[in-house]
């Protein structure tokens, strides 16, 4: 029997999941790694911890399954996007900690580019906004701040990559410096329609092209693992950014189909077919994938904080463990007038305000831990609701249902709240780690074992959550939410 091995490298941990060709989970392994916050608004990872945790997870998944590497048809990668790394081409030594997608240190760089009137150019070429979220200004910051880095980059001595590229480099022993279009499309340097690095944007930012990885199709040939890593070489046949992998794993293959992945942040993607749809309101135009020789596009809306809101409750002592949030929040019927705006690192779509910060409003002497727990869940659900309706309107589609996956999708109360605040059913698949499943399916396609047309029949619904809240109540809650968001905006003052 042959298997597919998915490496799912996330913001807080690295996963490896072994699947059958039909998408059934055989074994799972996960290892967490440290987040570093050197200053407010700065978020970093140790590149070696990313690699070592991912390698451990891959070995452990095979061990738990009792499967040797020769039984693995192919390996695929899904990864946190935008996170930016640079390393020496000769030695593979990282030259700075990885700057994580959540990091806001380049807000002033983005503002300077906007003041130069460049937002329209970047939007037209990449589908993205000038925001610290994306890789380009992180890379520019490194080139300006790390001594000697620009000179070495111009001589071709330095590699830049997102996390997929860093993993590929290490899996292949430095033989492959590559990425796929979904990851490239999140850098602010990639032309959405030509599917190439954009020479004009590189000139505008002063980024040497010699730094950049080769772009290969999402189901392309990315080499094979070094024999000593997993016991024998394994072909690498699929690479996708994590949110695009989840869209594929939800079998959202047609225009108008979409999903929301609830991880550290919440990420909504709506498939728009073979042509990009350009939208306002903070929505992004992006690649869904490049599979079977064709590109598919999507609209994306990002909520920077989702599961991280529950993590914050735990860190400040309101919860013992994250999973306790559901039972605690069930102790109350509502949030008691409390609004929790989870803008710890700014606001994503539809607001895109890097200067916003988190806020809890409406506190009284009667507010309890349970009210705060429920308000945190509602804050994430409100944020997702704003994005979902904006996305459906921009694409000219009615919102009929939302497919949910990721860690928070295991929380029944949260999905009940999400359905109530959206006013449409929320569907949970049997395999909720659809990011890894999408990576597995991409590599199955790359290995010739699957086709896109096979995927809808392999997707299974596990649960359906129906809205029960009266429309008048929903509208009243949203009015309060909008007031709370306005209080959180523009909180950080430059200088």
From Swiss-Prot:
Residues where ATP binds: 11-13, 264, 307, 407
- Copy the pathway line from the protein's UniProt record: Polyol metabolism; glycerol degradation via glycerol kinase pathway; sn-glycerol 3-phosphate from glycerol: step 1/1
Binding residue positions for ADP = 11, 264, 307, 407, 411
The GO molecular function terms of this record are: ATP binding; glycerol kinase activity
Q: Single GO cellular component annotation?
A: cytosol
Q: Which positions bind sn-glycerol 3-phosphate? A: 11, 81-82, 133, 242
Name a Pfam family for this protein: FGGY_C
Gene Ontology biological process terms in this record:
glycerol catabolic process; glycerol metabolic process; glycerol-3-phosphate metabolic process
Activity regulation field: Inhibited by fructose 1,6-bisphosphate (FBP).
Would the keyword Ribonucleoprotein turn up in this protein's UniProt record? no
The EC number(s) given in the record are 2.7.1.30
Q: Which UniProt keywords apply?
A: ATP-binding, Glycerol metabolism, Kinase, Nucleotide-binding, Transferase
Which of this chain's residues are annotated to bind glycerol?
81-82, 133, 242-243
Q: Which reaction does it catalyse?
A: glycerol + ATP = sn-glycerol 3-phosphate + ADP + H(+)
HAMAP family noted in UniProt? Glycerol_kin
Protein role: Key enzyme in the regulation of glycerol uptake and metabolism. Catalyzes the phosphorylation of glycerol to yield sn-glycerol 3-phosphate.
Q: Which NCBIfam families match?
A: glycerol_kin, PRK00047.1
Protein family: Belongs to the FGGY kinase family.
Q: What is this protein called?
A: Glycerol kinase
Protein source organism = Thermus brockianus
Lineage start? Bacteria, Thermotogati, Deinococcota, Deinococci, Thermales
Q: Which gene specifies this protein's sequence? A: glpK
């Amino acid at each position: 029997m042959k298997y597919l091995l998915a490496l799912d490298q996330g913001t807080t941990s690295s996963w490896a999941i072994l699947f059958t060709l039909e998408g059934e989970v055989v074994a799972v392994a996960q290892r967490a790694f440290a987040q570093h916050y050197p200053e407010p608004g700065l978020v970093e990872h140790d590149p070696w911890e990313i690699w070592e945790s991912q390698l451990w997870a891959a070995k452990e998944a095979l061990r738990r399954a009792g499967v040797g590497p020769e039984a693995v048809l192919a390996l695929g990668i899904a990864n946190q996007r935008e996170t930016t790394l640079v390393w020496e081409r000769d030695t593979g030594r990282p030259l700075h900690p990885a700057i994580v997608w959540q990091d806001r240190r380049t807000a002033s760089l983005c503002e300077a580019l906007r003041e130069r009137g460049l937002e329209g150019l970047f939007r037209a070429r990449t589908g993205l906004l000038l925001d610290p979220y994306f890789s380009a200004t992180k890379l520019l910051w490194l080139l300006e701040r790390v001594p000697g880095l620009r000179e070495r980059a111009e001589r071709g001595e330095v590699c830049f990559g997102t996390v997929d590229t860093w993993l590929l480099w290490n899996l292949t022993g430095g033989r492959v410096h590559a990425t796929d279009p979904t990851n490239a499309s999140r850098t602010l340097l990639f032309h959405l329609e030509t599917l190439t690095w954009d020479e004009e944007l590189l000139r505008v930012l002063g980024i040497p092209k010699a730094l950049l990885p080769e772009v290969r199709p999402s189901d392309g040939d990315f080499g094979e693992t070094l024999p000593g890593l997993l016991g024998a070489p394994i072909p690498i046949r699929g690479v996708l950014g994590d949110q695009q992998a989840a869209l594929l794993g939800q079998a959202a293959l047609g225009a108008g189909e979409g999903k929301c992945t609830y991880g550290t942040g919440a990420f909504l993607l709506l498939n728009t077919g073979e042509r990009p749809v350009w939208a306002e309101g903070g929505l992004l135009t992006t690649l869904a994938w490049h599979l079977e020789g064709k590109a598919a596009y999507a609209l994306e809306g990002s909520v920077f904080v989702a599961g991280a809101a529950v993590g914050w409750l735990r860190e400040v002592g309101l919860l013992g463990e994250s999973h306790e949030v559901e039972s605690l929040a069930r102790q109350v019927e509502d949030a008691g007038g409390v609004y929790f705006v989870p803008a710890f690192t700014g606001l994503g779509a539809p607001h895109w305000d890097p200067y916003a910060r988190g806020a809890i409003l409406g506190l009284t002497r009667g507010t309890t831990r349970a009210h705060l727990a429920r308000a945190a869940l509602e804050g994430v659900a409100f944020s997702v609701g704003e994005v979902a309706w904006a996305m459906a309107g921009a694409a000219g589609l009615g919102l009929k249902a939302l497919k949910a996956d990721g860690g928070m999708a295991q929380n029944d109360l949260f999905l009940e709240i999400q359905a109530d605040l959206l006013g449409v059913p929320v569907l949970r698949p049997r395999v909720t780690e659809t990011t890894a499943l999408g990576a597995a399916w991409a590599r199955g396609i790359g290995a010739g074992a699957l086709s896109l047309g096979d995927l809808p029949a392999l997707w299974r619904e596990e649960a359906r959550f129906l809205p029960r809240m009266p429309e008048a109540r929903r509208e009243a809650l949203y009015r309060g939410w909008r007031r709370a968001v306005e209080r959180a905006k523009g909180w950080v003052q430059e200088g």
